[in-house]
Amino acid sequence: MTEPAKLPWSDWLPQQRWYAGRNRRLTGAEPSVIVGLRDDLDLVLVDADYADGSRDRYQVLVRWDAAPVSEYSTVATIGAADDRTGFDALYDDEAPQFLLSLIDSSAVRSASGAEVRFAKEPDAQLPLEAMAHVSDAEQSNTSVIFDRDAIFKVFRRVSSGINPDIELNRVLGRAGNPHVARLLGTYEMAGADGTPETAWPLGMVTEFAANAAEGWAMATASVRDLFAEGDLYAHEVGGDFAGESYRLGEAVASVHATLAETLGTSQAAFPVDNVLARLSSTAALVPELTEYAATIEERFAKLATETITVQRVHGDLHLGQVLRTPESWLLIDFEGEPGQPLEERRAPDSPLRDVAGVLRSFEYAAYGPLVEQGAQNTDKQLAARAREWVERNRTAFCDGYAAASGIDPRDSAPLLAAYELDKAVYEAGYEARHRPGWLPIPLRSIARLTTA
């Protein structure tokens, strides 16, 4: 059990795409929990400490000696300890199947006061013989796909508490909602008092949506088709996305209705303090926000005395979080806004938070190609066509949502606009840090929303 402590964690962690400390200086990283799953496989929780006093805890499954799949050898190799080499086990040929078998048998593994519990959902069938490969998708966790049957999401940055991705998938699946992939199993480290509130969720397995297309890919393909047909309106182009936007609106409304029925609703004040705090911190980073700040503050302040209906929602919904299967739309990744504490990600919010997320995603799908081409400020015709595409799909989505729920988001225009503004402010901060070339997209939207 001493070998994991000898691995070069401070060198390896910052190289991983799921590492969350890129804007902080790492001062040290060492294992805090080591649980042996078998002789050549350890579950390790690594505490990463930063110069600002903060700490993250990461989960790494370490396979000893066995060579990983060759194409991943560099990213998977952690380093040497004594006479053995440690690898990220998720890239191994066989270790993921073993982890799946632990879930299938509802196994328990213990060491040094830590207990890891694997659990299969009732009546779940796990593909124990399926071939496994790591998904190439950029994300904050690591997903392993088992043929066309299941996807195993291993949480990387972990914390104690009820994980909303597991919680909401379970609730929606057991309620029979058709717009989520069925939860098959989970695993967690037990907390000090044995309750879900103190447990450390570590991963989950759901059905894999074979033959599914990502909403983002479908939407951007539609935009490219529109741009290629300079003499046609959006509804005349073969790749028109409005029908899918309508059906997506129906799916989101269905999920919201199930969550409201099963977990309830309540009344709460509009979170004016939270949105103003985000605006203040982002404006300090993005000087371009200064000219809009007073108007945004005024819009938010008008809602300060409003009482709104809140419930559990997705929390970070956009076109990259939805999949189109041959039968319907599926919503995935119910983790909420990345980087926020679990308690905040589980907090009830207005369903308009999710609606605004999709509407903002339409803006990105339409204007992203212009940014990539460097044409966002020069090609007036393409910009006009992008706006046409956005408005057509906004309308279709809201129409579908209203048809399925009986509640039209546009009837709460000031509140919906406030959630859109809050999301655009968040996007401005993200783009300023990571993709400055994309900053005009949220800034353009903020200008439009503050003059509407």
UniProtKB/Swiss-Prot annotation:
Documented EC number(s): 2.7.1.175
Keyword Cell membrane: no
GO term, biological process aspect, one: carbohydrate phosphorylation
A Pfam family per the record: Mak_N_cap
GO molecular function annotations of the record: ATP binding; kinase activity
Pathway note: Glycan biosynthesis; glycogen biosynthesis
Keyword ATP-binding: yes
Reaction(s) this enzyme catalyzes, per UniProt: D-maltose + ATP = alpha-maltose 1-phosphate + ADP + H(+)
Keywords, alphabetical: ATP-binding, Carbohydrate metabolism, Glycogen biosynthesis, Glycogen metabolism, Kinase, Nucleotide-binding, Transferase
Reported function: Catalyzes the ATP-dependent phosphorylation of maltose to maltose 1-phosphate. Is involved in a branched alpha-glucan biosynthetic pathway from trehalose, together with TreS, GlgE and GlgB.
Family label: Belongs to the aminoglycoside phosphotransferase family.
Assembly description: Monomer.
Name of the protein this chain belongs to: Maltokinase
Gene: mak
